[in-house]
Regions:
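Short hydrophobic beta-strand segments
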Residues: 2-6, 157-160
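Internal, well-folded beta-alpha domain core
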Residues: 89-186
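Active-site helix-to-loop segments that bind/position phosphate- or nucleotide-bearing substrates
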Residues: 4-91
Length: 186
């Protein structure tokens, strides 16, 4: 079984609490997307990010400093959304962290699919963003079936806790043998 969750918009760098154990599996694709972002003007990025000028400035700096191959924060600590706060990975014991590493997967506009201890750099790129990269019209087109194929290679059952935005990147591409149970919170 794998549990699929969405990332959070707010991110942080934490190189002290827990160390990442791996690079994201779709790092080459993330590099393509990073290059597509840097190929846009600052105003085009702000429109793509759909954010205020202040938030755009923070993310401009993050993009300028981004080193995908030497990030120091594990994904489980990088996101600051409410689900990550309540998961409280900073206080979990080793056995619990190992369970998360085996069973939890995080959808990502930039990285495609992450394990909790994959190293990530702070970024802003939602799956629904209309970023054109590698001849593809948007991120759904860019990622295609890669996240779903990876999940299908790992399990026969997915518990979907992700938003529609992120589950849409997985569900249509799964083989029929993989069960997909969605939990709707409302």
């Amino acid at each position: 079984m794998r549990i699929l969750i969405s990332p959070a918009k707010k991110m942080r760098v934490d190189g002290d609490s827990l160390a990442p154990t791996a690079l994201p599996r779709f790092l080459e694709e993330a590099e393509i997307l990073k290059n597509a972002l840097t190929g846009l003007t600052a105003e085009e990025r702000r429109r793509l990010w759909e954010c205020s000028e202040a938030i755009a400035q923070v993310n401009e700096e993050r993009l300028r400093l981004m080193d995908l191959f030497h990030a120091v924060t594990p994904a489980i600590l990088a996101y600051e959304g409410i689900q990550y706060q309540y998961m409280a990975p900073g206080v979990l014991e080793r056995k619990q962290l190992d369970y998360l590493q085996e069973h939890l997967r995080i959808g990502s506009g930039l990285y495609g699919l992450l394990c909790p201890f994959d190293s990530v750099a702070p970024y802003r790129l939602e799956m629904q963003a209309k970023l054109k990269a590698a001849g593809k019209k948007d991120l759904y087109d860019f990622w295609g079936g890669k996240p779903a194929e990876q999940l299908a290679a790992e399990t026969d059952w997915i518990v979907n806790l992700a938003s529609k935005e992120y589950s849409k990147a997985v569900w249509p591409h799964l083989p029929r043998r993989v069960g997909f149970i969605s939990c709707v919170f409302g």
